[in-house]
């Protein structure tokens, strides 16, 4: 695979970018600039030159329930200390729940093929029921709910109910070791704990009863809630309340401050104890609306399925797609579990669920390539990939395997709960490259330029989804040391890459994982291609061993 020719990848179809075109028209109608159609550079330049106007226009374009407030931003004079819409109010839960009651909100399936469907009306009923259950237990603004849960509708319901009451939501997936879960949840001192009785993976039932008991004993939450995946009851936990059909029709969630903490996500913990990263309410939602609608051409009637767990920021990214009127797909289990015919369970779900947008990873696409040919997915419009640099051969393979469907590699992180670089319906598609930077994201490469010289990915201007802070960092000192070392006006992301001549982005891996042998820098991407060509190799470790 590493030596496969880099033939031209499938481009975006001519009719793509409808949401992008609608946003341009909206800008002009609201007194903004009349930007030329199909010219990505003009909109990119406007978003960078006038970020306040761009983000305020996006709020209005998305018709977010709430008010952005009088001020576009507050600042202490640095990027690190800048916050967008400090006076704003937004109803996050309503933004995700609104729409026709009969429209499909969630299509969920596990690796056994068991499926759950929730309309927007049924989802509202479930969120209203859990919000009432939490409120009766004393849960309110400023409280935190921690969830240990597989990727199932109950996780989405819990996040929306928490947001509805002004709380903060954090989650881990069942594949975390008990100690790892406790290391993440304990600093949050949660008021409520939600745990499933277990999960299934590769045909095995994985009970969580013992872990749940350990968490409850250590965290001492005021509310301990559970739901069943394996059909068992957890001792000392109260089951989630069953919703009453139609009861949510007259229920409305509370508005929240745009800068109120909504999510806590966790760093990997590879360089010490995991950091709890606090994200606000409006900023990540605006970032996701931009990425979904303007970059991925996602809107009402579309269906987005991304392979993720509740321990990864892509889960939060996926959930936000409800705000664009899309149906979200939740898959729980091993992606390579047996599916229909010769397909795996994940791909079978993508086909049978008629998903228009499918999110994968380099590892998953590599496995598909090793399996050989297969049938296209008739409903598929956009193929996405993230989690690692995508090898150059993947674009040719995707075109062969899925037909004329654009393959968009996206890259960002937990730290910003969004993307620095991703797809774009109006930019050229290049094998081996992300199409470009996200709108209003002033990303660049430090010591990099257009001739292929690589550098560290940096961002030199504020954006709404910057973290509000870190857990147990009241002065912000750790946050500045982590993301703004040496300069409070430059975000250092740690990725390593360069620009292409067409404005695309090539990422080679993490800057701290780059090897330098005799002045030649080699990132992780340089090793993926040759190693992935060896089907007998299950895993590997690259070590820089000096000669001698």
List the model feature ranges, each with a label.
Residues 116-121, 254, 262-286:
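Conserved AMP-binding A3 loop
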Residues 351, 381-504, 511-514, 527:
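Conserved AMP-binding/adenylate-forming
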Residues 164-242, 361-362:
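Structural core segment of the AMP-binding/adenylate-forming
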Residues 199, 235-260:
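Flexible, low-complexity linker/hinge segments
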Residues 42-46, 93, 105-160, 177-182, ...:
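Conserved AMP-binding/adenylate-forming core of the ANL superfamily
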Residues 285-303, 313-356, 371:
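Conserved AMP-binding/adenylation subdomain of ANL enzymes
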Residues 147, 172-197, 351, 358, ...:
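AMP-binding/adenylate-forming catalytic core of the ANL superfamily
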Residues 150, 192-211, 332-335, 353-396, ...:
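Adenylate-forming
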